[in-house]
Amino acid sequence: MPTINQLVKKPRTSKVKKSTAPALNKGYNSHKKKATDLASPQKRGVCTRVGTMTPKKPNSALRKYARVRLSNNIEVNAYIPGIGHNLQEHSVVLIRGGRVKDLPGVRYHIVRGALDTSGVDGRMQGRSLYGAKKPKEKK
């Protein structure tokens, strides 16, 4: 327990919270060619590579991911959720924060059903997460 004098000399400092999605906290001023502090919930980007990655130790799969150059000129790896996708190089995508626990270096998710990304076909439950439209009812 510090004394009052110790606290007067050096007050308590609050912990600095590190962002889990740092690329969303930067903007880019193309006129001045400088990075700016402009946080946003999602960012637009262009796919530079689309491929698969194997997860960490106890799991086994081929997880789909895309390397995306964002509108603020930062390149990130983003996970493509859902079964099947239509992404290829030069596709324009929208990314949001959210890491994939068993893929190292993947801190972002691609938003399905936005821009060039199609929704998941035949998805009945949790449709809003995968950009799937409500199916037509049969009479």
Swiss-Prot record:
Residue stretches of biased makeup (Basic residues): 9-18
One cellular-component annotation, GO: small ribosomal subunit
Cysteine pairings via disulfide bonds: none
Matching InterPro entries: NA-bd_OB-fold, Ribosomal_uS12, Ribosomal_uS12_bac
GO MF annotations, alphabetized: rRNA binding; structural constituent of ribosome; tRNA binding
Domain of life: Bacteria
Positions of the UniProt region annotated as Disordered: 1-44
UniProt-listed Pfam families: Ribosom_S12_S23
Keyword terms, alphabetized: Methylation, Ribonucleoprotein, Ribosomal protein, RNA-binding, rRNA-binding, tRNA-binding
Protein function: With S4 and S5 plays an important role in translational accuracy. Interacts with and stabilizes bases of the 16S rRNA that are involved in tRNA selection in the A site and with the mRNA backbone. Located at the interface of the 30S and 50S subunits, it traverses the body of the 30S subunit contacting proteins on the other side and probably holding the rRNA structure together. The combined cluster of proteins S8, S12 and S17 appears to hold together the shoulder and platform of the 30S subunit.
Subunit description: Part of the 30S ribosomal subunit. Contacts proteins S8 and S17. May interact with IF1 in the 30S initiation complex.
Entry's family note: Belongs to the universal ribosomal protein uS12 family.
Protein's name in the database: Small ribosomal subunit protein uS12
